[in-house]
Structure formats: structure tokens, C-alpha cells
Amino acid sequence: MSLLAENLISPVVLCFVLGIVSRWIKSDLSVPEPIYQGLSIYLLLAIGLKGGSAIASTPLAEMVAPALLTLALGVITPVSAFFLMRRLGRLGVEDAAAVAAHYGSVSVVTYLAAAEAVKRAGMPGEGYLPALVALLEVPGIIVALLFASKAGASGGGWKKAMHEVATGKSIVLLGGGLIIGTLCGPAKLADVQPFFATAFKGALCIFMIELGLAAGKRLRDAGRAGTRLLLLGCFIPVVHGALGVAGATLVGMSPGGSAVFGAMVGSASYIAAPAAVRVALPRANPAFYLTLSLGITFPFNLAIGIPLYQKIANLLQSWL
């Protein structure tokens, strides 16, 4: 079975499709907000604990180059997204900066889907990847908002926006989980491992149904964004993702890890970035940045991007 078919025929992706279809047929299906919030807390903490456990048994020197690469791409990706949106997307400064903030950050669920995909393909990635997810979340948002500020865009409170990013649940739970996992190590985490491991994939499937419902709603707004922006919503993740895969391969990451890292870099945030943008760039149009991140790029990565990054990683590995 091809990588594309293998990726599409999986519980995680099909649950996302179920959510989209349910929205399109106007079903009354919904995931109650308390359950959705509980699932997001569970998933984020589980990722952090798993990453922290891996960090505890990984030599620090092995993580230095990937961490520096992550920070570098956290600066490069929002810059490229900003100029592409300005030149090709023909967006104003505020809207371009808002979109760039989303593409400069990371989608945790795209990371999860990519990690599951490479695991099914028999090429699992490095255990410390969750630490890189946390590291990639913030720099791109800051860089994009700086662009808006330097260009004279009228914004809201910077201080409040940065507080939204730094204290948001994704950073608190990912970062907190990483610290707890690192301090405790695999041995002390053994007691809670069954809870965070056994139910993880099932919880992710329910979470994906809710994301499918949200994406289905945003896909209805896709026409307002225009063909030019919709094409950029597919082009940008491929460029960023390929750059991520190439960089990860060059710093010595495995093919599986490089593919997952490419998916991370090629993703667009829909948790941390929207919170910051709403505060710092209140005049930016959500029809652009939310439709592109959740309605276009997220489904694109699930269906096509992840297997593409796997293919690129395998090709680069065979050449080097």
C-alpha cells in the first residue's frame, strides 16, 4: 500500500473526515465543550510527559543541533509566509502578519498525526520531538507580530498578546509535562504510563472528530478567501515542510524524525496563534487566518503533506 493510502486509511484521519462530513450534512453531532477541553488537556500533558521521559534518557549534545534548527526555522517560516501573503496573496500588512503568525507556529495535532503515521510505517521518530514542538510554538508568533509593528499596523496590547501565548494551555501543559517527564524519568512515570498510553489513540480520535467539525465549518468560508489564498494554503506547507525535512536530515535526525519535523514546520497553529492575533492584531480578518490554518493547511497536511514529508525524508536519506 502506498504511503498516501496508508496515511488516509487510518482511524485518526478517518475520524477527522467523519467530522467534516457531519458538518456538511448538517448532523447534530458535536463534542461537548467540557469533553473537548478535557481531551486537549489529556493529549497535551501526555505528549509532554512522553517527550520529557525521552529527554531524560537522551544525551544533551544530541539535542543541541535540532533545537537550534527549530529556533532558526521558527524565524524563517513566518518571514516567508508574510512575504508570500503580501506579494502573492495580496493581503494587507495586518492580515499577512496574522497569517504568518499561524504558519510560523506549530499545530500539535499535526505533530501527533505525523508521529502516528511514521510509527505505522515502521520508521518512528526521535523521542525528544515533543520538546521541539514546544520550542517551535512561540518564536514564529513573535516574529510575525514584529513585522506588523514595524510596518506600522495598528494593533492591540503586545504585553497582553505575549501573556496569552506564554500562559496558554498548550505551552503550560507541554512545557510542564516536559519538565515533569524529565525530572521523573521512565522509571517513575511507569505508574501513570497505562493511563497516558492506553487511551491515547482513542482520545485522539474523538478530538479529531471535533477538529473535523471545526474544519468543515471553515471550509464553507474557503470561497471568501479566494483561489490565490487557497493555493498558498497548500503551497506554503509544502515549502516549509520540505525545508524542515532537509534541515532535520542534515542535523542527523532519523528519516521518521525528519518526516515528523517536516510536518511540524509545515503546519499552521490554530490554538496559540489565534489567541495572540486576536489581542495584538484585532483588525486582522479571521476569515483569512483561521480558514487557511484550520480549513486548508490542516486537512492538506493530514491527507497529502505527511506522506509527502515521509517520501522526501526517505529520498534524502538514500542520497546522503
Model-derived features with residue positions:
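Active-site-flanking structural segment that lines cofactor/substrate pockets
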Residues: 40-60
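Alpha-helical transmembrane segments of multi-pass small-molecule/ion transporters
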Residues: 1-22, 30-34, 60-211, 216, ...
